[in-house]
Amino acid sequence: MAAASYEARAYGVYSATPSRTAQYKCPHLIFVPPRFDVYKAVAAQIREIFDRYSDLVEPVALDEAYLDVTENKLNIVSAQAIAQAIRSEIFKATQLTASAGVLGNKFLAKMASGLNKPNGMSLILPHEGLDFVAQLPIEKFHGIGKVTAVKFHEMGIFTGADLRERSVSELVARFGKVGRFYYQIARGEDDRLVVANRVRKSVSVETSYDPDLNDRVRIESALDRVAIDLHRRLEQVGMSGQTLILKVKFADYSQVTRSVTQSMGFMGVRRIQDSSQQLLCALDLEGRSVRLLGLGIGKLMNEEQDFHQLRLEV
């Protein structure tokens, strides 16, 4: 068995259960052959949704990933709101439910994501992290398998609270280098960063408006603010680029994109603003209401590359 539905799990059937055993436990079990092509296609859809919200997406499996939304593409302040929006988009695009854990580090987020499966979201505030970890059975800790759990039990460690009572030296002596990690997670600490395993191809920001913008002056003013947001984001990631992309979505959900490329790149906020306004000026907005404005930079290069390029051209 590669996987089992929640209905099958009620009969004691889980992934890795031998088929004969599974059928014995649940005689009316329905076996479905795998469709890896469909699985990969849906996973790609989900990944596209993740990428709309953050450049920092670290896939763990085809259907699972860590996202760092501290600086997200849509400038949404609430991580909980982002998680809910992503779950809604996934269901709308695939008719599949998704679970999410909203916390400040990878370990806690992974643990929380399993609390309300198959279709829920868990939010644990920073001051709640220690209590959450303390009550967890040690075998429920992400990264601790059956064999390691037995070793912990032999030491009299059955919960996160038990683990927290042990010193780092004791844990390192028993488990080696990973003992230090066990010491940290018992305290709800995990300093691992979310690492995207893809080369960044663009940096973008966008803003939605409610009510819609239907006055050209307001649209131009709003676009200038989006340009400021894009410049700020470029500074955060230490990048600039040679292609500027404008995205405009209208009230009827139709959208247009326009782009311009400059060999010198778009390094200053004024250059981004001027070029984006030129792109906007070429659009016919008469009688149309704007619901969303977006700007992006492609053909990226880091600041050091920019510096050397400019010096050579001089």
Where are the regions a protein language model picked out?
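Residues that scaffold, gate, or flank divalent-cation-dependent active/transport sites
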Residues: 1-62, 66
